[in-house]
Amino acid sequence: MDDGMAAQPAMGQPQVGDVAASSDAFPVAGAGDLPVVAPTSRIATWVRLIRPAALLLVLVPALTALALLWLRGARIMALPALAGLISLTMVQAGASLLDVYLEYARRARLPDAERHDQLTARALLAHSRVQPLTVLPVSIALLMLGALAGIPLLVSGGWPVALLGIAGLAIAFLFSATAFALKRFSLADLLIGLALGPGIVTGMMLAQRHAPTTRDLLLSGALGLLAMLPAEGAHLRDADQDKALGRRTLVTTLGDGVGRAIYVLFLLAGFTLLAFAALPKGAPHGALVGFFALPAFSIPLTGVLRARPGRAREQIVPQELRAYAVFGFWLLLGLAINAILISGLGPIPPTV
């Protein structure tokens, strides 16, 4: 059954969904919509508040970087690889919690009729037994622990990895925090694409003491563009709220029609870069298996093109996160199969 056919709650009755559908986080546009009842366990609430589906936005590019090195025949150093995965997970979780708390605090000023956030993490926080003020210190602690967990990457990769790590941590914090949060500005979504694509792939490869090739960057660009889609879907959904909060997103600045066109452009550009990275001779052809995810992306695309702003678009963000998860599965599976099949033929040379 299509998610959009789910029964609507009675008038005035709050509907609380999965954590991850918050409107526009870098940490990032959240994910799920699994249903409607707030968990009775505080642990379950905390798990939902970190938006588990959004963790894939950092884990897929990190694992892709390691898979590309495996295809080259490079020796994967276990400590930097594991530290990178742990650090990215903790920073993403901390940034998600920070965004949930700040969005909860900011949108509390809006009238109930303007919030339209029944399927979001901030709604879950509002109706859970978790004290909102406890979310803030936990989020800061996770960000700090994530930074500490990344120390092995700095030791292995040196100052270039340190610069990327500092930039990533700063974006994760400043995207939501302070009165001049980056998410308030039109071009901030480009930071999502750079951080969740080339930034992570480059950092993970440098920590393994290998430089990314042009085709590595093309593939990471595809990941970054597809990671921007949940944020674009959230902007299309929350245009009225963003206007009330004074945010200059691409949708509020250029209009709904242009916003939808940008969404389609990002989707097409992502798969175009994937083809450019995987089709040439000597390229990791297994990455082409990622095209099997196209049917999954058609579901949120239909909502973007046909649904009206507001409640009718509530399902776009969780559907987009599901589509990204499907893409990540097929991409990593294709790269793994590629590596296994060529293991007897020699690694793919690290050339353009």
Regions found by a protein language model. Give the residues of each.
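Topogenic membrane-insertion module of multi-pass membrane proteins
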Residues: 2-83, 87, 95, 180-183, ...
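Helix-coil boundary and interhelical linker segments in multi-pass alpha-helical membrane proteins
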Residues: 66-86, 147-163, 200-221, 273-286, ...
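Acidic (Asp/Glu-rich) catalytic motifs at the cytosolic membrane interface
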Residues: 90-116, 228-251
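Multi-pass membrane catalytic core of lipid/isoprenoid biosynthesis enzymes
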Residues: 112-155, 251-282, 325-327
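Intramembrane alpha-helical segments
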Residues: 122-211
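Extended hydrophobic alpha-helices typical of membrane-associated regions
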Residues: 279-346, 352
